[in-house]
């Protein structure tokens, strides 16, 4: 019994010593925008109004509002992506119904 209790204590100590892995929050937006400004990306950088819009329509809106965007990638939500930042790219994350589910951001 004491051995099980000791294992539980060790488990909790180890678990609390690791940084939690969590999804980025909406509040992280200003940090992303500041990073993009450091890269001197021009034009509109975010499109929060496109959440819930069909992805093909959203792609057209992004290309119209920022003519410097030459790569608008449509990806299924949760798809792996590279971490490099490019001022000419926007990733549109959609669901299986074809609607934008995350805020499109330059990068």
UniProtKB/Swiss-Prot annotation:
Residues 24-36 form a propeptide. GO terms for biological process: response to wounding. The record marks 83-84 as: Reactive bond. Transmembrane segments: none annotated. The keyword Signal applies. Disulfide bonds: none annotated. The keyword Signal applies. Residues 1-23 form the signal peptide. Keywords: Protease inhibitor, Serine protease inhibitor, Signal. It holds the Pfam family potato_inhibit. One of its GO terms (molecular function) is serine-type endopeptidase inhibitor activity. PANTHER family: PROTEIN, PUTATIVE, EXPRESSED-RELATED, WOUND-INDUCED PROTEINASE INHIBITOR 1. Belongs to the protease inhibitor I13 (potato type I serine protease inhibitor) family. This is Proteinase inhibitor 1. It comes from Solanum tuberosum.
């Amino acid at each position: 019994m004491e051995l099980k209790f000791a294992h539980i204590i060790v488990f909790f100590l180890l678990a609390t010593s690791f940084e939690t892995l969590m999804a980025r929050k909406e509040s992280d937006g200003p940090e992303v925008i500041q990073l993009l400004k450091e890269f001197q990306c021009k034009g509109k950088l975010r499109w929060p109004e496109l959440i819930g819009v069909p992805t093909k329509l959203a792609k057209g809106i992004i290309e119209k509002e920022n003519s410097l965007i030459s790569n608008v990638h449509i990806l299924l939500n949760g798809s792996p992506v590279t971490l490099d930042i490019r001022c000419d790219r926007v990733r549109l994350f959609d669901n299986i119904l074809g609607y934008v589910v995350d805020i499109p951001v330059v990068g």
